[in-house]
Every structure is written in C-alpha cells, then in structure tokens.
C-alpha cells in the first residue's frame, strides 16, 4: 500500500550524502498542512523517468522543487516530464537559482508558480490557497522575510537514518553583510542570527540523538565574536573523538 501525499517537497541533491536543509525548513513550517505533505529527495544522477514515477506514485496535487546551481538542468527535465504526463499537478519552484533572475530562466515558463527568497511562509500560504481551490493570479510570489523567531526550526525533520548516513547542515544565522561580486549572498541586506538559546537547544537535541558532524551553512560563522565563542563553548563541553565542525570564517575576526 502506497502512502499518498497532497504536497511533495523535493530536490535533486548532488549525491545521497547531502541532506537538504531548505526542504526541512519548508516542511516544518507547513503548519496544519504538514500531515498532508512529505519530503522526497533524489540525486542528479538518477533517471528522470524514475524520479517522476516515484513522485506521481504518491498522487500529489502540488510538488515543490528546490532549485540550485547543481540541479537546475536536471530539475528542468523533471518538470518537463511532469507537465507532459500530469499537467494538473501544480509545480512550485523555489531556491537561490531561480530567486533572482527568474524571468530569464527557461524552467520558470514550465512551472505554475515561483517563490523568490525565503519560502517558509509564502509556500504554506500558496499551498493553502491551492488546496482550497483558489488560483493565485501572480505566478511569481515574493518570499516573506519574517523574523527568524517566527520560524519552526528544521532539525526534527532529520531522520535517524539521516543522522547516521548523511551530512547534516545547520545554521546559526541567515544572510550576509558583505558584497562579494561572485556570490549570490551579496544580494542579502545583512545577517540575522537565530535566537541562540533556541538554536543551542536544537543542537543539543541533535547531539543527544547521536550526531557528531555538524556542517554550518552560515555565510560567516564568526561575524559576531561573542556568539561564535558561545557556540564553540557548547561543543567544547561535549567534545569527544568523533566531534567535527565545519564552518566558514573571515580571517580579520580571528
């Protein structure tokens, strides 16, 4: 017996060992719709027809894709296949690769909706409308930059299998104040920290579940020295031979 899901949140990772943090934010912020949704992750090496078959097997009404630089070509192929065999399924795109130059992207024309920027609140609102039979007129929907304290953290959506077998990504802050020309994050206005007690409580839960390798996706981990020291102290108090932290630093704050 197959489990059905009206909403599927999916992406094509570069390889199985990468677990999508973005999908888990979206899933954990669906509110009452979460029971009607599921996560499905694939890799860019999989056959498009196999991915489409697995997606449609759950008989979804909405499929949301996370689009990144490493998967946009493969994702466009998947969306083309979906629209040819299941045109009634609503396709929603989000992610950094289509948030800024969506008008010039071929994949945008194939989709029903595109959410630019932060998607947690905007996706939930869009799904509520679509499942209630409403059809928003605007194809491109700006993401809502709500205060981070309003977000449900994503970490409970990591399964025990994820913790055992995959890279687990975490973030203590969002955004970046720097304006490096080569980086999409230069379009951010500034960096916003998550409330630290709440963040460290979530890290402790992951630690208690057995996680020892933490990969921080913060654009600049040591932007605020006091916050950085507190996070490092948290891990130093729990340090064992398996502990591994990965983060990006700016040298002038060392």
Predicted features, each with a name:
Residues 16-22:
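Short N-terminal binding/cap micro-motifs at the start of the first secondary-structure element
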Residues 12, 67-68, 117, 249-251:
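Structural motif
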Residues 22, 26-29, 33-149:
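Glycine-rich beta-alpha loop elements in corrinoid/cobalamin-binding modules
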Residues 1-3:
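Short, Lys/Arg-enriched N-terminal segments with co-localized hydrophobic residues
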Residues 152-254:
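Radical SAM [4Fe-4S] cluster-binding motif and immediate context
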Residues 7, 131-172:
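N-terminal [4Fe-4S]-dependent radical SAM core
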Residues 16, 70, 100, 124, ...:
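Tryptophan-centric aromatic hotspots in well-structured domains and transmembrane helices
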Residues 5-15:
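Nucleotide-activated donor-dependent transferases that construct or modify glycoconjugates
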């Amino acid at each position: 017996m197959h489990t059905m899901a009206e909403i599927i949140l999916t992406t094509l990772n570069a390889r199985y060992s990468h677990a999508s943090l973005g999908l888990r934010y979206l899933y954990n912020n669906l509110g009452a719709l979460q029971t009607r949704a599921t996560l499905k992750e694939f890799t860019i090496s999989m056959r498009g027809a196999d991915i489409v078959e697995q997606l449609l097997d759950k008989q979804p009404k909405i499929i949301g894709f996370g689009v990144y630089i490493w998967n946009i070509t493969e994702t466009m192929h998947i969306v083309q296949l979906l629209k040819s065999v299941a045109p009634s399924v609503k396709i929603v795109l989000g992610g950094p690769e289509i948030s800024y130059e969506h008008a010039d992207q071929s994949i945008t024309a194939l989709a029903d909706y595109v959410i630019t920027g932060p998607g947690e609140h905007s996706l939930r609102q869009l799904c509520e409308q679509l499942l209630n039979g409403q059809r928003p007129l605007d194809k491109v929907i700006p993401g809502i930059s709500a205060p981070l304290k309003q977000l449900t953290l994503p970490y409970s959506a990591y399964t025990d299998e994820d913790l055992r077998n995959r890279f687990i990504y975490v973030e203590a802050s969002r955004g970046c104040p720097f304006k490096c020309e080569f980086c999409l994050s230069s379009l951010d206005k500034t960096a916003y920290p998550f409330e630290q007690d709440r963040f460290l409580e979530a890290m402790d839960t992951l630690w208690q579940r057995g996680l020892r390798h933490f990969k921080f996706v913060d654009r600049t981990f040591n932007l605020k020295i006091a916050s950085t020291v507190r996070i490092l102290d948290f891990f130093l108090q729990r340090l064992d031979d398996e502990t591994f932290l990965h983060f990006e630093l700016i040298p002038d704050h060392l």
